[in-house]
Every structure is written in structure tokens, then in C-alpha cells.
């Protein structure tokens, strides 16, 4: 499955940061992490911290799946509004999910600082705006339930939003915990950090089968080499759907475009991440090299090929919506791309064991909750 178009901004910006050999012999390891994107990087780091012997493999070069296509916006919100999630799993449980999102962002901040990762990590605020009066009326109860659970929110009226940020809206929720990052670079930096302390990494290593050997599973690669592990952790995101009989997520296309470097935008925009109530929603952020990035225009997944002409149409639509939201922004398109992502019925990730695979665990973040799986090491 091809998870992005070729022109991913983060990949073009950074290039191939670190390279690793493919597996050329049979090996044994305590924990095998499959997937070298941001989730695999975070999980393997947590396992190394806990003292495990870890081997990480990926069928591509590191970070070149959906991690290189993400907009790298870290928000505690998931795709399901808190008030709606409360109806599905209960108010207390729903609030806990949101609170864990805040904790995850704070933990990522500590991780970046402690391990001195050069990945453009910046703490920000998050502005969730209503695009019309009806949306504002529906958004205000969301603000009230977030305020009830002390999630660090304020309600901003349209005039205040326009004056401070130059954004046209009908009001919105300002949250005090969010962050932006270069997830592709962070994955590379974190994996390189752990290689220095003993983790083994093999890229361009594809699995063709997993054999159940009772207490220890055995992986067979395309080159007919074997990996014996005590536990396997799948951090392969949306590609894991091919392994599971249960349909845990629905695949979608999502699109993004980034401007040329510019210094003409309202500098207050550098302090926030922006998303709105439209369906499909629009999300916006600045980058650490002075660009403006806009994404969204999600569409139903139909096949494995992201068509170039569709990507161009979506890019035009994103820019059109952006200019309605930020009419004073001088946006000159530079790079546009698309990727395949997934959504679940409640917006929550899937973390844990599957009855289909003994001694195997799955850490699958879908939709807007990709920041949370770094806590999944607790399942051990």
C-alpha cells in the first residue's frame, strides 16, 4: 500500500536523514518492533527505557510511510468531540481520554528536551473555530464540557479572534495545550538515539509470514531470513488492517499543501494550531522555517493509488477555504501532497493484543490521536 504521494513536504525538506542495513541473517531478539514511523520510534524508545532488548524493522526506509505525510500537529483532541464521545463511552471515560491527550503532549515535550531531539518541537495553543453561526451554537456546549473537566480552555468571540489572529470565524475554543513538530525528523532522531544505546534497526526488510511457536513467535522475511522474538509489537498503523480480520478502522485520503517561506503573515499565527468545524474539517499551522501549512479535504479511500489530478484539485480547494478563513494571508503554494489515514468509530486508538496472533501486540493510532500511543508500553 502506498501511503503518500511522492511530494511529501517533510521528506523533501529533510531528505534521507539516517539509513540502516536490511536484514541479511537470522536473529533473535527480546522485543521486535515492526514499523519505523513515529509510533514505532516512540514505542521502541519506551521499551529501551524499560530495559528491553529491542530490534526495529521496516519494509521501507525509516519514516517513509504515513509519518512523512502527516501535518505533525499535536493536539489533545481526538476526532470525536468530547460531548459526542461522552455519549458513547460515558462522560468520565471520555474526559479521561482527553486528559491523557494533554499528558501525552507534556510527556513528548519532556522527551524532546531530555533526549535533545532536533525536530522543531514547539508548544502552542490550539484554536478550534466555528465556520458559521449554526456551528458556533453546536461548538459552545463542547467548550462547556471541556471547561467542566478543566482542560484549559477559553471561549473566544469572533471579533477577538479576528483582531488577534486575522481569522474570520463565528467564535471558537482556545486550548492552552498543543504543539507542533516535524514528526518525520523526530522519528529519525529518536531511532538514531536508541541505536547509540544498543537498539538494532533494519530497514528495507519486509515480513511475509508470522509463525506461532507457542511461547515465541517467529517472523520470516521476504529474503527468507528469520527473527525469533519473545514479543512482537506492530506499529504499522493503517497497514495493520491487512493483518486483522476485524475491521477496526475506515481508510480515508487526506491532503495538505504548504506555502513558500514568507514573513508576511500575522505572527500570532505562529503561536497556535487551527482547525475548524467543517466536514471535512480544515486544519492549519506554521512551520519552523516560516511557511504556512493547510490540510484536510478528506475523501473516501477507493484504491491504493493517489491520483495526481485529484491531489491538485484538493490543493486548490484547500487554498480557497484557507483564503476565506485568513483573507489577509499571502499564500503562495509551494508543495502539495496526500496520504492515506484512518478513522475509527469513536476516534480512539487500538492498543493491545489480538486473539489472531499470540505474543503479538498492536499499537495503532488512528485519526487525530497519533500522539497517544507512546503510553502503550504500559500494556507490557
Regions found by a protein language model. Give the residues of each.
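Rossmann-like flavin
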Residues: 88-193
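C-terminal catalytic lobe of FAD-dependent flavoproteins
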Residues: 302, 307-308, 323-380
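Glycine-rich FAD pyrophosphate-binding loop
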Residues: 49-69
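Glycine-rich active-site loop/strand segments that organize a redox cofactor
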Residues: 70-100
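N-terminal Rossmann-like FAD-binding beta1-loop-alpha1 element of flavoenzymes
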Residues: 27-56
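Extreme N-terminal leader/targeting segments of oxidoreductases
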Residues: 1-31
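Flavin-dependent oxidoreductases
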Residues: 209-287
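Helical element adjacent to the flavin cofactor pocket in flavoenzyme catalytic cores
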Residues: 145, 169-230, 235
Amino acid at each position: 500500500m502506498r501511503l503518500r504521494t511522492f511530494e511529501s513536504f517533510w521528506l523533501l525538506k529533510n531528505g534521507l536523514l539516517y539509513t540502516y542495513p536490511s536484514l541479511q541473517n537470522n536473529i533473535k531478539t527480546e522485543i521486535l518492533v515492526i514499523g519505523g514511523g513515529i509510533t514505532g520510534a516512540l514505542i521502541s524508545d519506551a521499551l529501551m527505557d524499560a530495559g528491553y532488548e529491542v530490534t526495529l524493522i521496516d519494509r521501507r526506509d525509516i519514516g517513509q510511510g504515513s509519518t512523512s505525510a502527516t501535518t505533525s500537529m499535536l493536539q489533545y483532541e481526538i476526532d470525536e468531540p468530547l460531548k459526542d464521545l461522552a455519549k458513547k463511552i460515558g462522560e468520565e471515560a471520555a474526559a479521561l481520554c482527553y486528559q491523557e491527550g494533554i499528558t501525552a503532549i507534556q510527556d513528548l515535550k519532556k522527551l524532546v528536551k531530555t533526549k535533545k531531539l532536533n525536530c522543531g518541537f514547539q508548544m502552542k495553543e490550539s484554536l478550534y473555530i466555528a465556520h458559521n453561526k449554526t456551528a458556533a451554537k453546536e461548538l459552545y456546549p463542547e467548550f462547556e464540557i471541556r471547561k467542566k473537566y478543566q482542560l484549559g480552555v477559553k471561549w473566544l468571540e469572533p471579533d477577538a479572534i479576528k483582531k488577534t489572529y486575522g481569522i474570520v470565524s463565528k467564535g471558537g475554543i482556545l486550548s492552552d495545550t498543543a504543539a507542533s513538530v516535524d514528526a518525520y525528523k523526530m522519528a529519525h532522531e529518536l531511532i538514531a538515539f536508541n541505536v547509540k544505546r544498543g537498539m538494532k534497526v533494519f530497514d528495507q526488510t519486509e515480513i511475509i509470514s508470522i509463525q506461532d511457536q507457542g511461547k515465541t513467535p517467529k517472523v520470516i522475511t521476504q529474503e527468507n531470513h528469520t527473527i525469533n522474538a519473545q514479543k512482537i509489537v506492530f506499529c504499522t498503523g493503517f497497514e495493520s488492517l491487512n493483518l486483522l480480520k476485524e475491521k477496526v478502522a475506515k481508510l480515508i485520503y487526506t491532503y495538505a499543501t504548504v506555502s513558500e517561506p514568507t514573513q508576511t503573515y500575522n505572527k500570532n499565527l505562529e503561536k497556535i494550531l487551527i482547525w475548524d468545524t467543517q466536514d471535512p474539517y480544515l486544519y492549519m499551522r506554521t512551520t519552523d522555517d516560516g511557511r504556512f501549512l493547510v490540510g484536510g479535504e478528506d475523501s473516501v479511500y477507493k484504491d491504493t493509488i493517489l491520483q495526481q489530478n485529484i491531489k491538485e484539485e484538493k490543493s486548490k480547494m484547500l487554498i480557497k477555504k484557507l483564503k476565506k478563513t485568513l483573507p489577509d494571508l499571502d499564500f503562495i503554494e509551494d508543495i502539495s501532497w496526500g496520504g492515506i489515514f484512518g478513522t475509527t468509530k469513536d476516534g480512539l486508538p487500538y492498543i493491545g493484543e489480538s486473539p489472531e496472533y499470540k505474543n503479538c501486540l498492536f499499537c495503532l493510532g488512528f485519526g487525530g490521536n497519533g500522539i497517544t500511543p507512546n503510553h502503550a508500553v504500559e500494556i507490557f
